[in-house]
């Protein structure tokens, strides 16, 4: 007398797949939190550019949940181009040579960043009710937008101001991509991102020339 092994219920398999995809959707949000907080600190410019590049990877990941690969890849490629443009205008002599931990400065930035995260997740829980997107997408976009605004409010340096503006724009792109699927929107966002990068690079060069005797 033989015994046949019963196949696992299809509903359980589908539920397991959905749970895995939901968990993976929160991974880029975690990366955005780490990179966003890291960009607030007094790190060498080279490390800041690496964090900025990783931030665009995580933003691409979240946009990919709403847009097809071709459109989402535009955000990643344009983001890396913006990083290259900004990096080409960096004055290494003005960059910190090591991690510059000023207790009163960086500690305040971390606390302010954590408050922004708390606010972003609180608003995300509310916006989740009326925006047709997952909580990971909404919270990730709000986290980037909030940390970008914080970056703008904490510094007047062209380098950090440009990073703040591009971070804010990335947060907007993540949320807007969940609402509208448009080639025109992707192209317009790319033009604005490159324009901000070129403007930031120009202001960085002007600042460097003014500092020279």
Residue ranges with predicted function:
Residues 13-213:
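Alpha-helical transmembrane segments of multi-pass membrane proteins predominantly involved
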Residues 7, 11-12:
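Intrinsic-disorder-associated, low-complexity terminal segments enriched in Asp/Asn/His/Tyr and depleted
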């Amino acid at each position: 007398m033989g015994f046949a092994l019963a196949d696992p219920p299809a509903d359980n398999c589908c539920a397991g797949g959905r749970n895995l995809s939901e968990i993976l959707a929160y991974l880029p949000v975690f990366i955005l939190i780490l990179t966003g907080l890291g960009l607030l600190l007094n790190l060498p410019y080279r490390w800041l550019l690496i964090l900025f590049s990783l931030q665009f990877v995580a933003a691409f990941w979240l946009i990919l949940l709403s847009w097809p690969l071709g459109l989402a890849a535009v955000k990643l490629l344009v983001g890396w181009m913006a990083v290259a443009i900004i990096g080409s205008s960096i004055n290494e002599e003005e960059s910190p040579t090591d991690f510059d931990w000023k207790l009163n400065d960086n500690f305040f930035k971390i606390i302010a960043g954590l408050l922004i995260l708390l606010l972003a997740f609180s608003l995300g829980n509310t916006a989740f009710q009326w925006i047709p997107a997952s909580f990971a997408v909404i919270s990730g976009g709000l986290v980037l937008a909030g940390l970008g605004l914080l970056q703008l409010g904490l510094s007047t340096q062209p380098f950090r101001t440009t990073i703040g503006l591009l971070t804010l724009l990335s947060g907007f792109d993540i949320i807007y991509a969940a609402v509208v699927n448009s080639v025109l929107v992707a192209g317009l966002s790319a033009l604005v991102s490159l324009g901000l990068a070129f403007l930031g690079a120009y202001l960085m060069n002007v600042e460097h020339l003014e500092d020279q005797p």
